[in-house]
From Swiss-Prot:
The keyword Secreted applies. Belongs to the RxLR effector family. This is Secreted RxLR effector protein 10. A motif (RxLR-dEER) lies at residues 42-56. It comes from Plasmopara viticola. It is found in: Secreted; Host cytoplasm; Host nucleus. Effector that acts as a broad suppressor of cell death to interrupt plant immunity. Inhibits cell death induced by cell death-inducing proteins, including the PAMP elicitor INF1 from P.infestans. Residues 53-63 have a biased composition (Basic and acidic residues). The RxLR-dEER motif acts to carry the protein into the host cell cytoplasm through binding to cell surface phosphatidylinositol-3-phosphate. Induction: Expression is up-regulated at the earlier infection stages. Residues 1-22 form the signal peptide.
């Protein structure tokens, strides 16, 4: 009797859920008509100032600080996401320092390769988080 109830319940669920599936003519109407070309996407800055020359350095912001750090790199770090903040809190609780993360992620790598690594930004964000929480 239980097997029969299971089979009937499964059949009812499958039949009712099959009506929610889009048929092929419906799918054609849902698809966008515009093909996205990733190479043709322009940045907002270029579209706002079409006549500006982006290759020139702005005299006010050269991206270099006298103490040797780059302000451009600090600006590009951005805000960590919620999950990155959770990860940072876990690392801080476990006693990991930014030096430990650099060693874990980038040991034996060239500096040019490190800056192109997706984890480079994460480690920089953790350094900022670590400094803020250590000073409290």
């Amino acid at each position: 009797m239980r097997v029969l109830n299971f089979v009937l319940t499964t059949t009812v669920v499958l039949l009712t859920s099959s009506e929610g599936i889009a048929s092929s003519p419906q799918v054609r109407h849902i698809k966008p008509n515009v093909a996205i070309d990733h190479l043709s996407i322009r940045s907002l800055r270029a579209t706002e100032n079409p006549g500006s020359d982006e290759s020139r350095l702005n005299e006010k912001d050269t991206g270099f600080d006298p103490d040797g750090s780059s302000s451009k790199e600090d600006e590009d770090i951005g805000e960590p996401t919620f999950w990155e903040k959770v990860r940072f809190r876990y690392w801080k609780t476990m006693g990991k320092t930014p030096g430990d993360l650099r060693k874990e992620y980038f040991e034996g790598m060239d500096e040019a390769v490190i800056k192109n690594n997706p984890n480079y930004k994460l480690v920089q964000q953790y350094e900022v988080y670590y400094d803020e929480k250590s000073s409290e």
